[in-house]
Regions:
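Conserved beta-sheet core of the metallophosphoesterase superfamily
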Residues: 229-231, 235-339
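An acidic-aromatic substrate-binding cleft motif
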Residues: 98-115, 119-124
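Beta-strand-turn-beta hairpins that frame and shape the catalytic cleft
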Residues: 96-106, 217-231, 276-279
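Acidic, histidine-bearing metal-coordination/catalytic regions of metal-dependent phosphoesterases
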Residues: 1-105
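Residue-level marker for buried hydrophobic side chains located in beta-strands
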Residues: 106-108, 139-141, 185, 231, ...
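Active-site glycine-centered loops adjacent to acidic/histidine catalytic or metal-binding residues
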Residues: 111, 143-144, 188, 234, ...
């Protein structure tokens, strides 16, 4: 209902109380039985309208405040904070549960850059077909699904035969129509160049595939209780293997697999951790070739590692056989098929 505003009598009363109580607001407020805040508001209003001790003949309407009540707003902030804390706790080392004890693999799609003239579509299609026809092989997107040029870099669309609309259609195809059994999507720097793109992906994510910005830490859990911890990021801090080793040491070797993309190169490294468990460090190259930026900086145009496959064996006879890495979808799919046939 509309605010009736202060009456002349209320404002006059506030002025009179002020002068009758030694011009001390707290005493005037107590005299009128008002809170200090309410009294100060009435006094300010009366002064603004020129009220003086005595009777006034003019009544001016008072308008309600158009901002939220402070306490109500603080209550809302508290709920938002709690929900954010709950979300962060849920996504930190979330669990992907395998309902049997057969070995499984994750095909880590390196930066796809769909729509780019340099996207190796032929190789991408081959890898997708292999995944669709290999039992136990799942897909994970390391990020940079599209070029997604934004701000000043939007001019680079002139160098490709694609529009932003077409890029988004390609991303939808990759997510929903390519037939890939996804378990994870990460958002890279290119995905975030246009703020609406990641929101669009989340909106069409009908299968509720985990979609996280930049990094995901999760556990692959098998029926027999075996667990494999994965620390995947579009890129980990630093670009050398030393940095990934240091990250592993700094985090107490909290993962079995450290995976990254971003730099359009690939590598695999395996070593034994301090607890006698194998550690796998990998970077997938991605599908963007013929990259002028890389050419200008003199980077090698690597041919392998578009995707990297990690295979997890929950029934391995040797601890060192628990995790294996492969530099291509074809190699990983072949090994996984052979391994599952022996279980």
């Amino acid at each position: 209902m509309p605010n009736p505003g202060l009456t002349d009598e209320q404002m006059q009363e506030a002025i009179d109380a002020y002068y009758n109580n030694g011009e001390v607001q707290i005493r005037a407020a107590e005299k009128l039985g008002l809170s200090k805040t309410t009294y100060e508001h009435r006094l300010r209003r009366a002064r603004a309208l020129g009220f003086r001790p005595g009777v006034q003949d003019v009544e001016i309407p008072e308008f309600p405040e158009n901002c939220p009540d402070v306490e109500a707003f603080l209550d809302l902030q508290e709920k938002r904070f709690e929900r954010e804390a709950e979300y962060r706790s849920a996504v930190n080392w979330f669990r992907i549960k395998i309902k049997n004890n057969l070995p499984v693999g994750i095909n880590w799609f390196g930066d796809p850059h769909l729509g780019s003239n340099g996207c190796n579509v032929k190789q991408l299609r081959k890898d997708i077909d292999l995944i669709k026809n290999t039992d136990g092989l799942y897909g994970a997107n390391i990020g940079d699904t599209i070029d997604g040029w934004g701000d000043r870099m939007a001019r680079l669309y002139a160098d490709n035969d694609v529009s932003r609309t077409t890029e988004w259609k390609l991303a939808k195809w990759f997510l929903e129509e390519a037939g890939i059994p996804w378990i994870l999507w990460l958002f890279g720097n290119h995905d975030n160049m246009h703020s609406g793109f990641t929101k669009y992906l989340k909106a069409i994510n009908a299968a509720s595939i985990p979609m996280l910005d930049w990094q995901a830490k999760f556990v692959v859990e098998f029926k027999n209780g075996e667990e494999f911890r994965v620390n995947a990021a579009h890129n980990h801090k630093g670009v050398s293997w030393f940095h990934q080793l240091r990250e592993a040491m700094n985090t107490g070797y909290d993962a079995d697999v450290y995976m990254a993309g971003h730099h359009h190169n690939w590598a695999l490294m395996e070593r034994e951790g301090p607890h006698g468990k194998p550690l796998l460090y990998a970077r997938c190259r991605g599908y963007k070739f013929h990259d002028e930026y890389a050419d200008h900086l003199g980077f090698q145009d690597l041919q392998g590692g578009c995707s990297v496959v990690t295979v997890f064996n929950p029934v391995a006879k040797s601890t060192m056989e628990r995790v294996r890495g492969f530099k291509s979808t074809a190699e990983g799919a072949e090994y996984l098929t052979w391994l599952r046939s022996r279980v």
